[in-house]
Amino acid sequence: MSEMTPREIVSELDKHIIGQDAAKRSVSIALRNRWRRMQLNEELRHEVTPKNILMIGPTGVGKTEIARRLAKLANAPFIKVEATKFTEVGYVGKEVDSIIRDLTDAAIKMVRMQSIDKNRYRAEEMAEERILDVLIPPAKNNWGQAEQPQEPSAARQAFRKKLREGQLDDKEIEIDLAAAPMGVEIMSPPGMEEMTSQLQSMFQNLGGQKQKPRKLKIKDAMKLLIEEEAAKLVNPEELKQEAIDAVEQHGIVFIDEIDKICKRGGNASGPDVSREGVQRDLLPLVEGCTVSTKHGMVKTDHILFIASGAFQVASPSDLIPELQGRLPIRVELKALTTHDFERILTEPNASITVQYKALMATEGVNIEFTEDGIKRIAQAAWQVNETTENIGARRLHTVLERLVEDISYDASEMNGQTVTIDAEYVSKHLDVLVADEDLSRFIL
C-alpha cells in the first residue's frame, strides 16, 4: 500500500494531468486516508469507513486518466469498470458482484508478483544450480540417484563464475521445464463466468504438473527457471488469504460512465434492466456486504468506490437517493480552455508532442514544435470543440494526427530532415477544415 502524502500524490498526478486540482486533492486525501486508517487500533479501524467519491465533468477532461494514474500510485488492488457493462440480477449480462471477483483476481495477481519478487534471490540460486546440473551432471550412486557432494567441485565453481559473468549466455542446453497447463476453452453463458472459471481451473489441474524437455539458450532458460522456482516458493493458501485481506482493507473500485445508468431527467418508463436495477444492485457493494468468490468470501465494507460521469444529459440528482448518499464527496471537473490545451501539449512527461517527436525520430526525421505552433494547435482544437461536439483533450489527438499525416507517410524518405511545425504550418494544414463546420465535424 502506498505511503505517499496527499501533496506527493498530487505532485505525481501533475506530471501527467493538467489542471483539475480539486479532483486531484480529493483522490489524494482518499488514498492517504487508507493509510491513516491502518495506523488505528483494530476496534476503531473497523468503524472507519471510506468516503466514496463522485467525479462530475464533461468528457475528455481527465476523469479516466486520474483513475489510470491512481492505479499505478496506489500499490493496492485496483479495478476500473464501466457501469454500462452490467445488468440487473436475473437478466442476461454481467452482474455487479463480478466487480469484486475481478478485484480479487487482480489482488491475487498483484500479491503473487510481490511474493515472487520477494523470493527472487533464492529462486535465482536454485535456477543456477539446475543449469549447472545440466552443464556438469553430478555423480550418481548405485540406485541411479544424483549424489550431493559436500563441497562443489573446482569445475562446477569455474562454470558458476562463467555463468554469472554471462560468458555462457548463448550456449544451448536441454532442460526440463514445467509444461504449460492444458488449455480448455469453455464458452460461458452470460452471468455464469464464475462457474466457467472454476471448470477451467479443474480441467487445468487434471494430470498434475508435468515436465517437458526444451532446448534453449542459457540466458533464456535462466529467466524461465527463475520464474518456475519462485512460483514453487509461493504458498497458495497464504497467497489467497493475503490477497483477500488486501482487497478488504485497501481495495479501490473505479466505476466509469455512472451517468449512463441514470433515468434521463427521471421520466423514463419501462423496464430498467441496465439502469436503475444496476444502481440498486450496486448499493449493497458500496454500503458493505459479503461476496462469494472462487478464492473465498470477500467483505466490501472498507473498499473505496470512486464513480465518475459526464452528466451531460442526466444530473447527479437522477441517481437513486440511496446511491447518492453513499457517494458523499462530490468533485466537479472543469471544461478545458485553450491555455489548458497548450499545457497538455507541452507539460506532461509523455505529452503528445513528445510522442510524435520520438516516433518520427525512429526514421531519422526531426520534428520541432514552435511556441506559436503549439498555440495555434490548441486554438484549432478548442474551436472545433466549440462548434461541434466537445470531446475535451481527445480532440488534440485528432488534430495532431491530421497535422503530421503527410510527415508520417513520407518519413521513410525524409531521413535527416527537420520539419518545423509553426503557426504558418498549422494554418496551412488545418484552417480550411476548422473554418468549415461540416468538414471539421467529419474529419476533426
Curated annotation (Swiss-Prot):
Signal peptide: none annotated. It is found in: Cytoplasm. The keyword Nucleotide-binding applies. Disulfide bonds: none annotated. GO terms for biological process: protein unfolding; proteolysis involved in protein catabolic process. Belongs to the ClpX chaperone family. HslU subfamily. This is ATP-dependent protease ATPase subunit HslU. The gene is hslU.
